Amino acid sequence: VIGGDECDINEHPFLAFMYYSPQYFCGMTLINQEWVLTAAHCDKTYMRIYLGIHTRSVANDDEVIRYPKEKFICPNKKKNVITDKDIMLIRLNRPVKNSTHIAPISLPSNPPSVGSVCRIMGWGAITTSEDTYPDVPHCANINLFNNTVCREAYNGLPAKTLCAGVLQGGIDTCGGDSGGPLICNGQFQGILSWGSDPCAEPRKPAFYTKVFDYLPWIQSIIAGNKTATCPP
């Protein structure tokens, strides 16, 4: 996260850290004791999922590591379009218990409204050159825009996405924040998918997969319908 500050250790009990290699990691969001949501483009063959984590180099007493037991990506996702249906649901190999630094966030009950102030968070780059990664998650507030702002910035926008950032630039998610949550008015509304390169450019908000539009798919999979398909 560019232009933010260290998150309060108590504000992100639902935030998980997916580690694949020193060069490749993502954010994830715990939605119940056994399931996390992230971006499909964060998928790797081998993933360690840390929950209850704040400082990467120092373990919290209640920090735990889990692995994917099952992974679900929309069966109708366009394979060669990284930004299409950029959402992945992962079942943990063992449930987690709620503790000081671990608690799920519920799925949104309403879609977010344009103009909302939203919170971003993650262990991603804190410099636009993407050469400085923090030991602790950084948090910042950004604004939810009308999708036309992103359409103009990127000559288009995938369906079922949210467009969020700061028009003057300087505050944004960045490399390593992918898959992490966009929290608007206390509700988990988005999953970081893609943004400008370099990050935090003026008039180039990032886009986030719109969780609300995928609720039927998420709820079907969790209920045991493993073949559920996503909206087109």
Curated annotation (Swiss-Prot):
Tissue occurrence: Expressed by the venom gland.
pH dependence: Optimum pH is 7.4-8.0 for the clotting activity.
Uppermost EC category: hydrolase
Disulphide bonds in the chain: C7-C139, C26-C42, C74-C230, C118-C184, C150-C163, C174-C199
Gene Ontology BP term (one): proteolysis
Chain positions carrying an annotated carbohydrate: N98, N146, N225
Active site: H41, D86, S178
Localisation: Secreted
Known catalytic reactions: Selective cleavage of Arg-|-Xaa bond in fibrinogen, to form fibrin, and release fibrinopeptide A. The specificity of further degradation of fibrinogen varies with species origin of the enzyme
Regulation: Inhibited by diisopropylfluorophosphate (DFP), but not by hirudin.
Keywords carried by this UniProt record: Blood coagulation cascade activating toxin, Disulfide bond, Glycoprotein, Hemostasis impairing toxin, Hydrolase, Platelet aggregation activating toxin, Protease, Secreted, Serine protease, Toxin
Gene Ontology MF: a single term: toxin activity
Domain spans labelled Peptidase S1: 1-223
GO cellular component terms, semicolon-separated: extracellular region; secretory granule
EC number(s) reported in the record: 3.4.21.74
Record-linked InterPro entries: Peptidase_S1_PA (IPR009003), Peptidase_S1_PA_chymotrypsin (IPR043504), Peptidase_S1A (IPR001314), Trypsin_dom (IPR001254), TRYPSIN_HIS (IPR018114), TRYPSIN_SER (IPR033116)
One Pfam match: Trypsin
Function description: Thrombin-like snake venom serine protease that clots fibrinogen by releasing fibrinopeptide A from the alpha chain of fibrinogen (FGA), induces platelet aggregation through its interaction with GPIb (GP1BA/GP1BB), and activates factor VIII (F8).
Protein family (similarity comment): Belongs to the peptidase S1 family. Snake venom subfamily.
Quaternary structure and partners: Monomer.
Designated name of the protein: Thrombin-like enzyme bothrombin
Species in which this protein is naturally found: Bothrops jararaca
